[in-house]
UniProtKB/Swiss-Prot annotation:
It comes from Streptococcus thermophilus (strain CNRZ 1066). One of its GO terms (molecular function) is nickel cation binding. It holds the Pfam family UreD. This is Urease accessory protein UreD. Keywords: Chaperone, Cytoplasm, Nickel insertion. The keyword Metal-binding does not apply. GO terms for cellular component: cytoplasm. Belongs to the UreD family. Required for maturation of urease via the functional incorporation of the urease nickel metallocenter. It is found in: Cytoplasm.
Amino acid sequence: MTQVYDGFVHLGFSNRNGRTISHKKYQEGNSRVSADNSDANGVPYYFLINMGGGFVEGEQYQVTIDVNKDAHALVTTQTPTYVYKCEKGQLTQQNTSITLEENSYLEYMADEVIPYLKSRYFQTSRIDMDKSAHLIYSDGVTAGWSHEDLPFQYHYFRNLTQIYQDNELVYSDQTLLEPEKQDMFKLGYFEGWRNYNSLVMVSPNIDETFVKALQKHLEGLNLESDFAISSLDISGLVLRILGRTAEDNRRIIYSCADYFRQEIHGLTPLNLRKNDMRR
């Protein structure tokens, strides 16, 4: 590792005799990982943990995940990502690098980012995957936190997610929020809501029939948030959600992930051992 990070995690998963094992678990600085054995399907399940409770101004973090051929892993954050105020104007950054080999399957279920008053944050995620691999990837951002409980008091938030299949860029999504320069309540931004989440699913098993069936499934639920599903140019879809609370949004995310798990892979619903999972 040539660059020094304030927190660094590297997880590697392999298939051994039909069972996925973690062959690499490295942690450094403020970052830690914790295993959980609650998944009824025997899928390795890891929490990403920040020992400081949040990201401090100017800090840089790296998460690297490698899923080898035929392996299946589930990775999530223990809590939302708190980005503390940046009084000196320095940028806080996190980079995530994911590699998925042939017929591998990763469920990366990150909680939303909560930017504090005056914070500046840049998050990048690059996923390199084989065309036969399966991916569920979620993240999000809220209206933030301030002592006065006023929304959108942070200065800068940028999130760039890119997916490559066989070295070709097939998906690129960027969220850029500068509340001092933008009206966060108008059409095209938060539109009066306080929480935004997105979910990307890529799999050779996702086609237009699956997307329509998922849409119908979600419409049959009693949901509090607004959402929209779009098919990708490749075999996949993207779900975007605006909601009153992060818990409302996560309910939709988990419903989508469970539908994919059950319909495509014959797996039981997610059990992430988080408070809002039991609501």
